[in-house]
Amino acid sequence: MTIKEAQETVDRWIKEYGVRYFSELTNMTVLTEEVGELARIMSRRYGDQSWKATDPRGEDNGKQALGEEMADVLWVLLCMANQTGVDLTQELEKSIEKKTQRDSLRHIHNKKLLA
């Protein structure tokens, strides 16, 4: 699925099942919440935090939950792009070009990355 197709799919879903988009501010808050849930999984899977004994997501060390939370973040981001008229394909292409021009030589000699 392309980014454009994802935006279109989310838009159809919202119109068919979601009634309408939440307000932009509400979706910003929901995005923050979803990023926090992703951060919790990351801190337990890759960081120093331990899984709670009662948390079933820890059974596979959060592998399934990690993907689910990333998808939730993407969903809300697609909603926000749709409701604000942002073409994420176009913006991602511009962002990659900007980073390439700005950072093409930036990390080549970074000893922390070469280790």
Q: Would you name each region that the model predicts?
A:
Residues 1-70, 74-115:
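Flexible "arm" and connector segments at domain edges
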